[in-house]
Amino acid sequence: MADVLHGLAPLVGAGARLLICGNMPSVMSLAAAEYYGNPRNAFWRITGDVFGFAADAPYPDRVEALVAHGIAVWDVLRSCVREGSLDSAVRRESMVPNDFGAFFASHPTIGRVLFNGAAAETNYRRLVGAPPVPALRLPSTSPAQTMRFADKLAVWRGELAD
């Protein structure tokens, strides 16, 4: 039996304007206590390209860059049971969502949600309900997602522009 996994605290600053919402951090991310800790995940390459920071900069610097651009990052799941890192391996009955009601109440300047992939959107809507602000699903930045990097970058760039 797999152990219960617990997600990470949100990355958010005062005046955040946009929430990027994933499903649950990967095994590598949880081990490093860093969002998108798998170097094959395109998240930091994409956000670095859009906001002008190095994708391989120290984690605190990357987080600071996102916060400076009004970007918050959090995941749908507070905890779950999952074998490996794939979203499809999460046991549905084990899913416990984060408290998004309290999150949005504490961060009223967030005006949009971007879901990082289908699992994040599906699980948010199933477990939490409709987001209180406009929301859009973007292609997953996961290495398991087969879309070409250039295509992912183009879609994400269009939605992240300041």
Annotate each PLM feature.
Residues 1-112, 118-147, 153-159:
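A polyanion-binding, active-site-adjacent surface
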